[in-house]
Regions:
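The conserved beta1-alpha1 loop
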Residues: 30-34, 102, 238-239
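Generic detector of ordered secondary-structure context
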Residues: 8, 24, 34, 202-206
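Pocket-edge structural micro-motifs
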Residues: 8, 18-20, 238
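N-terminal cap/lid segment of alpha/beta-hydrolase-fold proteins
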Residues: 1-13
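Short active-site segment of divalent metal-dependent hydrolases/proteases
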Residues: 36, 105-106
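Flexible "cap/lid" subdomain of the alpha/beta-hydrolase fold that forms the substrate-access gate
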Residues: 12-14, 56, 63-100, 107-259
Length: 259
């Protein structure tokens, strides 16, 4: 593995990790982590995939060794997608890449495949436990206004699973939630999620600043969603033991993704 530091047009420095031999003409796979992780969460699988792909992962702004903007507005999804575009253009300037996103990584990748900035640059997208916020907002609206009782129960179930999002929108509550519930993320959530999570040196900082992702985006997308369609081939991975993202969020994905 090698690490490089990439400066973007908005004066953000991104820590980018690359696995695989640059001299091998292998397809490039870009992996985007979620909250409250950093790119090291991909290390084990990146090492395994590096035999067939040139694997790239980076710390998103506010996480790991990348820049940490102070303003909440700096964490809007459009800036995250600009960061992703900078990484893609740096590591694969001429060839389309394959994209994988988990949690908040998937959320921003949905934006990337449904907006013009990266048109033609993404060969495929694998989404793990993260919907488009716009798609999720439309799903809720349609379910509440036109859906069956079963649809409404699914929405209520998802809202119950998303309890922490409301807490993150209140400064004092979000700090308390993080310190009490999430500061020991691996120890607390490995048993719940049936995962073997590791501690990272920047874990507390990643969580503290990553909360701004929620504050910068959720309310706007919930009340002002935009129709976002894509022709990029999509592979959807739905972990069966995810305690925060329910499968129902993807019930009507076919109306947005044609492949």
């Amino acid at each position: 593995m090698k690490t490089l530091h990439l400066s973007t047009a908005t004066d953000i420095t991104l820590a980018v990790r690359i696995w695989g031999d640059d001299n091998i003409l292998a397809p490039t796979l870009v992996m985007v982590h979620g909250f409250p992780d950093n790119s090291l969460v991909w290390q084990t699988i990146a090492e395994q995939l590096s035999t067939i792909f040139r694997v790239v992962a980076y710390d998103v702004r506010g996480a790991g060794d990348s820049s940490i903007p102070k303003a909440t507005s700096a964490y809007k999804i459009r800036y995250l997608v600009e960061d992703l575009a900078a990484v893609i253009n740096a590591v694969s300037p001429t060839e389309p890449i394959h994209l994988i996103g988990h949690d908040w990584g998937a959320i921003q990748c949905w934006e990337a495949v449904t907006t013009p900035l990266l048109a033609g640059r993404i060969a495929s997208f694998t989404s793990i436990s993260g919907p488009s916020l716009d798609h999720a907002a439309y799903w809720m609206r349609q379910g509440l206004t036109q859906g069956s009782m079963d649809d409404k129960r699914k929405i209520l179930n998802q809202l119950i699973h998303s309890w922490y999002i409301a807490a993150f929108h209140f400064p004092l509550a979000s700090q308390l939630t993080w310190r009490v519930a999430f500061n020991k993320w691996p120890q607390m959530f490995s048993p719940i999620q049936a995962l073997n999570l590791e501690d990272f040196p920047t874990q507390a900082s990643d969580g503290h600043h990553g909360v701004k992702l929620y504050r910068a985006n959720f309310i706007e997308r919930l009340f002002k969603p935009q129709p976002r369609h894509t022709t990029v081939p999509i592979q959807l991975v739905i972990p069966t033991q995810d305690k925060f993202v329910t499968p129902a969020l993807f019930d009507y994905l076919g109306q947005w993704a044609s492949r």
